[in-house]
Amino acid sequence: MYKLCRCSKPVKRLWISSVEKNDIIDGFNNLKNDSDYDRLFQSGYARSKADWLVGMNGTRLFSAMYNNFLSVGRVQTPTLKIIVDRENEINNFKSEKYYTVLLNCGEFTAESARIPDLPTAKKILQNVNAGTAFIKSIKKESKKVSPPKLFNIADLQKTANRLFGYTAKQTLDYAQSLYEKKLITYPRTDSNYVNSSMKDKIIQLTAAASGIMSAEISFTPDADRVINDKKVTDHHALLPTLSVSDADIEAIPDSEMKILRLICSQLIYAVSPEHIYESTAITVSCADTDFTALGKKISQMGWKEFQLKFVSLLTGKEMSVKETIFTDNIVEGLVIENHSEKIADHQTTPPKRYTDSSLISAMERAGNEDYEDENVEKKGIGTQATQAGIIETIIKRGYVERSGKNLCPTQKGISLIEAVPEEIKSPKTTAIWESKLQLIEKGEYSPDDFMNEINEFVKNLVDTYSKEDNINKDLSFRAERKVIGLSLIHISEPTRPRLIS
């Protein structure tokens, strides 16, 4: 609006991550110069123009080619390809049997490495049965598991999908409602950290969160663990607000309450002590074959103590940490006097279909190996604020359908991926663009140069694939409308997109 009105008046920006009264007042007392966000604006504006140009022209092009409305997008099509590729992996998967030999040593059972065929397994079993078993080595190692980071929106969506079956959009909607109720901070964040200025507030918020979770905090919260000024993006990580202490819990819908408790529990985990345990690996040798047994002895439960309690509270399922502790009489060189053995057969399993949780993870990783600049952060495809919408879009378009938690491609979705060229559906293209958009945000790349590249990409796409000989005649789509004609949408003025009716 500022540009359209040709306004040149100075502008201050209210930049807050919470709509609590004190945060709003503090925000107005510390208004930001709008010019501080010029590069962020340029990057976001270039992103939206690129998405519009690629989506509008790609959609018109392939809809006309196949006489069917085929929605194509810079992010949605690579996302669909991820799902289709997984379906192809499942359909082409051939299960294979393999075997291991289990050696029962009385106090524990050790297992051999994978054996590819049954005759070999039987031969090993025969040799072991006649052999002498002894403990070849014992290796002990103290290990620490750091607490998880604070939630960003993608992490919250993945956890809610895994625990409650919520779709990414449902989680975002519930979080938005909690934000408007002043119970959590701005939800559409991609950061896992907070600024150093929030150190004291983190201590206060942990106390408030413990009240929501009915948890007794007997340690001093380690606020430094969640502070990283360099990694805080436009908004800090998702947090509860101090208002949760006075909230009418009974008035909050159950679905929203689960999300609020997830956010509160994540804060408590993040500032809790480490989980420490001792791992033990015992190697037993018999008839020139090694067998391995693994043990775990917990030294300090740390944050996992809260995780067990909170996940049980949220899901109604009892959670526990399994320990395998070996007695002190298990020492190197010990001969196992009485041992028994048997063959265990196993089957390789196909990869699982994507859920909202695993698809968001795949989107975060997609194309990361193709980033051209090592100095930019690898963020995959789509932004964390838009990934839920992308999933819902490809479902709405009829390319994907839900089967329980699973996301399954339809025949139309599979055919679309077969129809469009690699440069449209490959995450590599998006990764290259994402790296340049980040450089624009840093002031290290020209928005005009980026848009010139997009314009050229779209022009080449239409020029190349509008020819009839590029139509895959093996594909058939159900005709939905009569196509009158096809023309390239004018791209010399990409800053003023127009509605195409």
Stretches found by the model and what they are:
Residues 1-142, 237-297:
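Phosphate-backbone binding and catalysis cores of DNA-processing enzymes
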Residues 23, 155, 358:
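Ca2+-coordinating acidic residues in Ca2+-binding motifs
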Residues 67-71, 140-149, 158-164, 187-196, ...:
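Conserved short loop/turn motifs at secondary-structure junctions
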Residues 92, 168-169, 190-488, 492, ...:
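Basic, low-complexity terminal or inter-domain segments flanking catalytic cores
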Residues 131-146, 340-349:
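Positively charged, polyanion-binding regions of nucleic-acid-associated proteins
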Residues 152:
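N-terminal cationic and glycine-rich segments that engage phosphates or anionic surfaces
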Residues 181-187:
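Secretory-pathway/luminal and periplasmic proteins that interact with or process carbohydrate-rich
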